[in-house]
């Protein structure tokens, strides 16, 4: 069995090397092989003999890519979105598809939290006094909501699809008991954080959801964070707003037209990064693990490995806290694990030297809060660090 995988999938060799040799030797002809590829430049000829194709979001999987292949049976995307996959084409050919929903949700939520502590320090903001508006109540929005709840930060969630599903839920109490608000309510919050997929058309499109009309509703003192899909914000409308002197503070991890970036917008951002919010080691590796589990199910075999088998220890595996929790301690804890200013500096210095894709491909190892054990020296201290996701003994 030949398994082709994106070269940027962590631990792909560890997870899949044994699977590609299954059923070898039956006819003595085909040899199992695990083949890495560059996701942006993949061609139909390269994958003409693939039995399994494992991609990330930069690879378009459609008839154009697979028309030379008459044997492929499984396509996996080690990412949360599916807008790069022609699902109807795969269904027509009876090709099994699996994505990795929620694999990097924690990573993105921790990116947002790092951005918030950086901006709070920069502008002397008290985080507990802010209200955060979350657009999108799926996996990532939920993880962010959990962390904000742990910090006692008020927040609102806008998700019309989940709101409709909630109304149709006949169970008592409803499975989802969250209160959803209209977009206009979220746009009035002190912080607006976007966590929706790209949806073109339909009843609730998200393509250019934050357009000139909605941008005009923003106040000068607000913070706008986008760590979902680049097309959710109209970048040219945002640039027009900023060049007109509007004071809204911008954090952009995603950009319209990636890997091309609207260069003129960069100086107007507080934090700018190369679509790496979900790029923690755990976040990327969970995608590999989820596809491994799905392929094992497809092959009717029991999974042999899990992510914990491969994750290394963090550079600072454990710390002890001998004070109660406050915003200063939050700042220190978050930055100890992930300081988003590092990625912002690399982006500004290296974007036009290395290129957008190269920044992503060569992204340094970054860990999640769970990689660090926090020991509290007194049982009277708040367990907020643990509720934020830090490990405990």
Swiss-Prot record:
Which CDD domains does this UniProt record tie to the protein?
A: ErythrP_dh
Enzyme class of the recorded protein, top EC level: oxidoreductase
Metabolic or biological pathway, per its Swiss-Prot or TrEMBL entry: Cofactor biosynthesis; pyridoxine 5'-phosphate biosynthesis; pyridoxine 5'-phosphate from D-erythrose 4-phosphate: step 2/5
- Extract the signal peptide range: none
The catalytic residues are 229, 258, 275
InterPro entries linked = D-isomer_2-hydroxyacid_DH (IPR050223), D-isomer_2_OHA_DH_cat_dom (IPR006139), D-isomer_DH_NAD-bd (IPR006140), Erythronate-4-P_DHase (IPR020921), Erythronate-4-P_DHase_dimer (IPR024531), NAD(P)-bd_dom_sf (IPR036291), PdxB_dimer_sf (IPR038251)
Q: Which keywords appear in this protein's UniProt record, sorted alphabetically?
A: Cytoplasm, NAD, Oxidoreductase, Pyridoxine biosynthesis
Which molecular function GO terms apply here?
4-phosphoerythronate dehydrogenase activity; NAD binding; protein dimerization activity
SUPFAM superfamilies membership: Formate/glycerate dehydrogenase catalytic domain-like, NAD(P)-binding Rossmann-fold domains
* Any single Gene Ontology cellular-component annotation: cytoplasm
Q: What is the reaction catalyzed?
A: 4-phospho-D-erythronate + NAD(+) = (R)-3-hydroxy-2-oxo-4-phosphooxybutanoate + NADH + H(+)
Subunit (UniProt):
Homodimer.
Q: What does this protein do?
A: Catalyzes the oxidation of erythronate-4-phosphate to 3-hydroxy-2-oxo-4-phosphonooxybutanoate.
Q: What is this protein called?
A: Erythronate-4-phosphate dehydrogenase
- Please tell me the species this chain comes from: Colwellia psychrerythraea (strain 34H / ATCC BAA-681)
